[in-house]
């Protein structure tokens, strides 16, 4: 989910999200730096979100999702509208997230659904009419 508040800088936005998620104050700075490093947006932290490319906005959305280290991360159409290079980068990020989190991915793009995110882990594919 790309960020909604595009008039904030990346850092301001992640601080806001950390507060909403009730991350303890003494852990916020550390966690924000860790997720920015993870999704490779540290060099964008002082830029307004509205001035970022679609790929970087997606990364900010991933950082937001990872903040607080939830056990499950749900991603809806994480590569829609990205160029081929950005798709590869986001896929790699999702694979790395899958090492520490359960990632639920939703996409109507067949190539995205068929992409092998699941090497060495459990993976499930279901069509909408067959979800239970």
List where the protein language model places each region.
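Hydrophobic anchor residue at the start of the ABC signature
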Residues: 62
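Conserved ABC ATPase "signature" region
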Residues: 15, 19, 26-44, 95
